[in-house]
């Protein structure tokens, strides 16, 4: 794992979303029926964006909040990450880089891997630790990697924002200008976090969906959809027959 440079925003840190696990357990479960609708919209939007370089191997940055309250979600993500590779046909390829933050200013990126077992080994050896969000570092790293070689999709999974939303929106806008879409998964129902995540998705021409641990099949479908987009663009995503995959098309601008 490679450490990422960066620093805390100090007085610019703005608390958004209760990261206390008890509070999230009692108030952070999406309404039944709402998740399916969000999944449908998310999948529809993804397929509306055409990849400019579908002839090359797709590259997907898989970023997760690994602070203490996120351990259950991290465990679920570990079990579901292989679904991303199942969406890729034999003639195509997908490279994934794991990026996570936790603790006091710790933000690390893995090497790029092209196999589910390699990614699983990287994720299994990591535990969650208390700390504030570092989404700004995620966006900055995505821009750096995108400058080296195009990233076709950034996936971010989190439940809170403890940084300046305006500063994050500016960084998201920079990624949008570079045609680097972010697909944001929100656990919980904090309306302020949702509004910010949706704005980041809009600015980058990406998409937003809820991350519902009680619906692993829908989450798997979402991951497959984004992976299909990253490796083959809109055409490969259209081949995905699942409802979530088709619904993701609706959000992405043409």
Language-model segments: what does each one mean?
Residues 2-61, 68-74, 90-92:
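Acidic, polar low-complexity linker/tail segments
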Residues 53-111, 115-157, 161-166, 188-198:
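Von Willebrand factor
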Residues 66, 103-106, 160-163, 188-191, ...:
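Solvent-exposed loop/turn segments at secondary-structure junctions
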Residues 111-124, 201-211:
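Acidic, Ser/Thr-rich peripheral helices and adjacent loops at domain boundaries
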Residues 167-171:
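Charged helix-capping and loop-helix junction motifs
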Residues 178, 196, 203-204:
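Short, structured coil segments at secondary-structure junctions
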Residues 204, 208-254:
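C-terminal "exit" segments of structured domains
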